[in-house]
Amino acid sequence: MKASVAGQGVVAAILENNGESWIKYYNTDGTEIASSHPNMDSPGYPMDLSLSSDGLWMAVSYAYEDGGKMKSQVAFYNFGSRGEDLVDNLASSSSYTDMLCPQIETAGTSSWVAFFDNGFRIYEGTNKPKETVSVSEDGEILSCAYADDRVVLILRGESDDHPYRMKIYNLKGKQLADENLDFYYQNLQIEEKQILLTNRQELCVYTLNGRKKYSGVVSETQIHEILGMGQNRYLLAEEDGVSMIRLK
């Protein structure tokens, strides 16, 4: 299951049941606002979804086959007053050939970041969202994240000394950093305006402009999850319990 929660508590989710997919949209009291039953023919298999911060927009990425080619579609649904006169609340959509969009993130009330297997795209609009920025990468993208107006991509590196490469962009598509990484990471996330790379026992922290702040061992067992608590404090969920660390 994949789910997205808007600021006021409404929830949208992709549900799977007996090999079939459903997209459900629920109010704060649990009542159903909308429901759809997409399939591979129309509009495709739902890969991910994201609600706008005000809950009026839902962005959904689909994958489908057309003429023997795999395609993807990014669709935007309006559940405000403007969407009442639209067929199935669909305001706009964009289709792409030979690429998939496994992840889509909301960047406010009228902006979205869609991650593809070859890069990312930015969509903007209050009536009919459309693509405004397109960034493509030649290398293999291993991980991606968005928060605080920053798009972070981890690509496979070109040497054993630097197995990964991190690129940071703003929402205009401007590249802010391109760093070779010697840290063997397993997870990427953005917390408290910091880029966090973790593996079993280690943490590596970068600023949103690509400056390394810390790299070292923070757990004697195994890190399951890490949460930013503000003021350079992080809560570690470890194999044997929970601990708090503070970085100088």
Predicted regions and their residues:
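A short beta-strand motif characteristic of beta-propeller blades
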Residues: M1, T31-M40, G83-S95, K128-V135, ...
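Short loop/turn segments that connect beta-strands within beta-propeller blades
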Residues: N27-G30, N78-R82, E124-K128, Y169-K172, ...
